[in-house]
Structures are given as C-alpha cells and as structure tokens.
Amino acid sequence: MASKNIVCPVCGASCDDIQVELSGDRIAVKNACKMGNAKFQEIVSSHRIRQPLIRENGAVAVRPAQWEEAIERTAEILAAAKRPLIFMGSETSCEAMEVGLHLAEFLGAVADSNSTVCHGPTAMGIQEAGRVGATAGQSKSRSDLAVYWGTNPLESMPRHMSRYAVYPRGHWTRRGRFDRTVIAVDPRKSITAENSDLHIQLRPNTDYELLSALLTLLHGKRPHPSVEEVTGVSLSQMEEMLELMKGCKFGSIYVGLGIASSYGKHRNAEAAFNLVKELNTHTKFVIGALRGHCNVAGFNQI
C-alpha cells in the first residue's frame, strides 16, 4: 500500500510531501529526513503498543484489554478524580485536542500540553507583544533574509532550510540561496552558524540585552557601552546585523528554545516580537518559532 503527501509526525516543520509504502512488516519512506524516517519506522516496530493495557490494583505487570473495557476504566478513573490533569501530547490532531479541552472543562480539570516544558515562554511573549507572522509559503516566496536566533535547524529541523527558508527557489527569490542572506545568533558555533553569512556569537543568557541594544539602535540612539562587555558582541557587529535587517526586502526571524530557555524567558520573546514590529517601519519583517513537536503549535491555537 502506497500513500503520498503524508504529513510528517516529527517536528514543527510539518513537511507534507512524504511518500510512504507499507508492505507487510516493512515500510519505505521517501522525502523525509532521518528523524522523519525513524519515526515512520515505529509503525512496524516490535515495541509499538498496539492494544490497550490495564494495570490491576497497582501491580507491576499489565494485561491486554479490549477497547470497550479500557474506555470504561478510563471514564471511571476520571470521574473519581478530584482534580485531574489532562496533559495532551503534541503529536495528535487539533480536533482531538479540542475534544480533550471540552472534556477538561466538563471535569473541572487542568489542561496542559508540551508547551509548558518547551516554547511556553514564546507563547507568553506573543500574548504580551503580539506577533507579525507569515506562512512558510510566503517566506519561501518572498524572504531574502533569514535570521536563526537560538536555534540550530540543520540538526533539529533538518528540512527547514532546504524546504522553506533558505535553499528553495521562490517567486521573488528565483536563485534560492544566492538570493538570500542568513544570520545565526547563537553562543555556539553550530553547523547552522558555520553555514551562515553572519554569525553573532553572543554570550549565553544575554539575548535580552542584545535585543534591547538592537531596538535602541533602531530608534537612532546608541546603547550603553557596557552592552558590548555584557553580550560579547561588538557595537559594529550589532550595527552590521541591523543594517542587513533594515536593508532586506522581506526578513524572517526564526526563534528557537535558545530564547525561551535562557535568562529572561518570555521577556526575551517579547523583546524579539517588539523588534520585528519596529522593523516593519523600515521593511517587511515577520517572526516565527521553530517548534519541536509536529503539532505543539496546534494546542496553542486551539
């Protein structure tokens, strides 16, 4: 059995051009990265759980059960709970998440998802500042500047640069990579930084200070000289980065957990979103987060 245009269930890139051919206990995958291929291989894996399992009275062992019994047992546990927590994974559909939220409301439960331990601060930053965003297709067709801030997509989201942001030919970026400039903001010299046109190697946990300095420069003022010592980034590098951002036709910033997990948390994200809003007085600029799980963004939308 062959299927085409399957959405990959791994990372937030949500590549929708995957081809899968299932034959008995073997599966062949095309167009997916290594992470995507490994995920699809789980379908035929020997350790895949294929039926409900019930643990009786705290026993170590579990026993197989029919779906009807498992659903009834689950309902009994939820009905008896005083304050249940419904933690919805980020690898299921928006429709299933919506049902889960209705269930949580009916039970008076707490509903949560992977955002709490992932890009939760980024979502809070959006609530504080708002977000100027665009679809991946718009960035592919229009963007001539990509800024990767606190993320290393060549390892964590392998097809982002090749399918959406840097290498593909777009309507106004006919030459692909040759029509684009790439900036990496990362304390480490990652593989993404090595393949960028400009690497801003700031000190760990100084994202907020660097973002604030860029905002100050954007407003036509000079930041305090101490910002160079604090961030480890020279004022000339900040000015070079800002000129590239102001001079592009359509810029895209992609933030990762480097912003959400460092000192400042949601205030880092808020500053990044405010910077993008201010950049739109000079050119067209958008910002988005590179999410880890395939539908972790879906829960935030629901």
Q: What positions do the PLM features span?
A:
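N-terminal export/assembly segments and adjacent metallocofactor-ligating motifs
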Residues: M1-K221, G232, L257
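Intrinsically disordered or highly flexible coil/loop and linker segments, enriched in small
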Residues: R83, N152, F250-Y254, T281-F285
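Active-site-proximal structural scaffolding
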Residues: A96, S139-K140, R175, K246, ...
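Residue-level signal for secondary-structure boundary elements
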Residues: D112, H119, R222-V227, T283-I287
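Internal, well-ordered alpha-helical segments in soluble enzyme and binding-protein domains
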Residues: S139, T206-L210, Q237, M241, ...
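A charged, amphipathic alpha-helical module
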Residues: R222-S262, H266, N274
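A glycine-rich, hydrophobic/aromatic-adjacent loop/helix-cap motif
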Residues: A260-I302
